[in-house]
């Protein structure tokens, strides 16, 4: 059963993501609601997780709308366009990430998220 992650940013932007049924994500259910400081890196929003996930990065070339775990920073990353590492419109992660799912609602609103904005994260099973 997949996970639904709701992201409510202090600017009023709301994004809903669906993550795969990855056993390691059970750790997020223990902290099913938390706040974090969102950061922007080009057209990527990322924020630190309250628990460390034991997942290894697999790739850097991403697709618009993909959600991934960044092991180096213990962050969840949402790609919605080119990043500083991109050569064209395809998002490229800073280092290898583990793809976990997709944005299913609000992808276009991510451009309105500011650097260091607070995000309220809610995680539940579908």
Regions found by a protein language model. Name each.
Residues 13-22:
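Short, contiguous acidic and Ser/Thr-rich linear segments
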Residues 10-12, 73:
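Glycine-centered tight beta-turn/hairpin loop motif at sheet-sheet or coil-to-beta transitions
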Residues 3-10:
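A short beta-strand micro-motif
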Residues 21-24, 32-126:
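Glycine-rich active-site loops that engage anionic ligands at enzyme catalytic sites
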């Amino acid at each position: 059963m997949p996970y639904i992650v709701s992201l409510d940013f202090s600017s009023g932007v709301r994004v809903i993501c669906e993550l795969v049924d990855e056993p390691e994500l059970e750790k997020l259910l223990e902290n099913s609601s938390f706040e974090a400081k969102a950061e922007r890196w080009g057209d990527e929003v990322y924020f630190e997780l309250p628990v460390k996930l034991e997942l290894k990065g697999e790739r850097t070339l991403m697709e618009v709308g993909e959600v991934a775990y960044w092991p180096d920073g213990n962050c969840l990353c949402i790609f919605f366009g080119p990043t500083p590492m991109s050569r064209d419109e395809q998002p490229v992660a800073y280092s290898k990430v583990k793809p976990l799912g997709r944005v299913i609602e609000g992808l276009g609103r991510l451009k309105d998220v500011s650097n260091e904005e607070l995000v309220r994260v809610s995680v539940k099973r579908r």
